[in-house]
């Protein structure tokens, strides 16, 4: 063998033969080889370029929040093109830019005389280009189905903040006539489909319809029978998330006309309590839920929205909710053998009590406004009738009107502070002492759902009455400091912020206790604390007394959002 003889081993590659082969190649073959090499180089450079684009996506997402308008517009255009070419991460930018809908839409003139379009109008153009413009080669029905699917898919995995911004965007687009009527009808078909479609599709359809109804209340008002039959009927009873979004859609039936400052008139539509809608709403609240998944969040979400709908749409919501609380109280305290269900029913009752109390306070404010509106109308009529005989001076009329409004305001304030939670005939007063007792006895009532509901209701009760707030403020601060449940601590922080808005002096005296949440190990508690403190400080509701260092530490936090 060659290894034994010491002779060098011959290479398997014959270089001479290779050179001879290259020399023998024809001119056409040589050109083909060069073209293949150039093509390979082109693809390599293209891949490098794509990787560089993907690396720049996170930076461009941050530029969407830039104070430089030109940078924002260029970033939006990049994500529009990148999304069409399916660049990895482009969908993150398209999803992030939706919050720009809240930007003030003012055109900007550059130094060269060119004019930059407003950010909000440009955002509408980008979304129309990506999800609404017709694709070439599609029929009319295929285009409508594609637009419908694109709109529904925008709700998949969306956060609450994203859904809020999406609602503002789609409502503006609908107000401008960019959403075709055929698309709306297709969304209703998906929502009411008798076929076993996915839950996400049906939920997405009613979410989009609810968003569009913000600009056109008739869109859901005309289909109320469908809402009651599907979302509050047999389908919604098995899918409480669908029922929740159906209740949100019902809220738009009343109309979204905002009250103009200085006026008394309101534009909400209300229905008699005999309307079948209220029977369905009460039924969805009272229906017992023993499913483990429903216990975590779904039932509480649908109950909250159902109560909101009752108070917004009903002519006498307090009477209906009184009967609702009586039925739930009897069910919670009825003797059964299933101890677990008893505790969960108690948690449901406590939650409903708290939210009814809060909505009743808002209802009293509406009643006060209605009293003032009717009195203003009577005064106008009386002034017109007596104007010819003995006209009164403007100052005299203003004094009388102001005195009457003060009397009405004082009466309502007394009812709110003394009657709702302390009145001898008040149903809510029965739970005024029960809720703090549950919160302060975690060993006796260890159920996590009951504790969360009780803490939330305690916060709502404290926003109603100054006397109740002062009596239980120490307990709420104690929960914020010692509770082992991060959800209870997070809700306690938000509750303290709400209490500070209602009764600022009480919280300002204990503001240093609020800063403790900035050092909480749970990210949700920390974010809620920072959000509440930012709101209270910027609006002058609490004073900073040497705690700036605690806020400055947040700049070094590992979490970028903090």
Per-range role (PLM):
Residues 1-562:
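Extended alpha-solenoid helical-repeat scaffolds
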């Amino acid at each position: 063998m060659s290894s034994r003889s010491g002779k060098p081993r011959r290479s398997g590659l014959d270089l001479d033969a290779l050179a001879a082969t290259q020399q023998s190649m024809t001119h056409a073959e040589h050109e083909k080889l060069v073209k293949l090499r150039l093509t390979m180089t082109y693809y390599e450079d293209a891949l490098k370029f794509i990787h560089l684009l993907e690396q720049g996506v996170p930076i461009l997402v941050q530029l969407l929040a830039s104070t430089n308008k030109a940078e924002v517009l260029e970033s939006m255009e990049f994500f529009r093109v990148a999304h069409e070419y399916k660049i990895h991460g482009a969908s993150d930018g398209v999803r992030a830019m939706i919050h720009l809908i809240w930007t003030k839409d003012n055109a900007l003139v550059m130094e060269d005389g060119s004019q930059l379009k407003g950010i909000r109008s440009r955002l509408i153009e980008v979304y129309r280009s990506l999800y609404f413009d017709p694709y070439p080669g599609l029929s009319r029905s295929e285009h409508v189905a594609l637009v419908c699917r694109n709109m529904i898919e925008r709700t998949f995995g969306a956060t609450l903040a994203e859904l809020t911004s999406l609602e503002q965007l789609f409502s503006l687009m609908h107000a401008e006539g960019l959403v075709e009527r055929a698309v709306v009808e297709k969304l209703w078909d998906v929502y009411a489909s008798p076929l076993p479609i996915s839950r996400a599709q049906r939920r997405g359809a009613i979410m989009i319809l609810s968003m569009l109804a913000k600009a056109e209340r008739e869109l859901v008002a005309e289909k109320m029978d469908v809402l009651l039959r599907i979302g509050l009927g047999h389908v919604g009873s098995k899918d409480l998330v669908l029922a929740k979004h159906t209740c949100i859609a019902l809220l738009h039936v009343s109309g979204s006309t905002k009250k103009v400052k200085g006026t008394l008139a309101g534009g909400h539509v209300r229905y008699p309590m005999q309307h079948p809608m209220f029977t369905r709403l009460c039924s969805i609240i009272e229906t017992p839920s023993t499913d483990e998944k429903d216990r975590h969040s779904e039932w509480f979400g649908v109950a909250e929205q159902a109560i909101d709908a009752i108070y917004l749409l009903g002519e006498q919501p307090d009477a209906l909710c009184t009967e609702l609380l009586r039925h739930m109280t009897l069910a919670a305290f009825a003797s059964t053998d299933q101890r677990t269900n008893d505790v969960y029913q108690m948690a449901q009752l406590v939650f409903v009590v708290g939210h009814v109390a809060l909505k009743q306070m808002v209802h009293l404010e509406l009643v006060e406004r209605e009293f003032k509106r009717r009195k203003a109308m009577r005064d106008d009529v009386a002034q017109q009738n007596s104007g010819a005989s003995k006209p009164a001076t403007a100052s005299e009329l203003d004094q009388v009107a102001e005195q009457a409004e003060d009397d009405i305001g004082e009466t309502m304030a007394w009812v709110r502070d003394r009657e709702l939670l302390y009145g001898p005939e008040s149903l809510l007063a029965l739970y005024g002492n029960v809720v703090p007792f549950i919160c302060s006895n975690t060993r006796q009532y260890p159920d996590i759902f009951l504790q969360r509901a009780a803490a939330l209701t305690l916060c709502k009760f404290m926003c109603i009455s100054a006397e109740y707030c002062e009596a239980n403020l120490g307990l709420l601060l104690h929960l914020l400091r010692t509770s082992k449940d991060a959800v209870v601590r997070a809700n306690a922080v938000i509750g303290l912020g709400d209490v500070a808005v209602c009764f600022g002096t009480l919280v300002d005296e204990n503001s240093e206790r609020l800063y403790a949440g900035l050092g909480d190990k749970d990210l949700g508690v920390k974010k809620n604390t920072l959000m509440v403190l930012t709101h209270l400080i910027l609006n002058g509701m609490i004073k900073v007394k040497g705690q700036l260092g605690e806020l400055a530490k947040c700049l070094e936090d590992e979490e970028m959002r903090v």
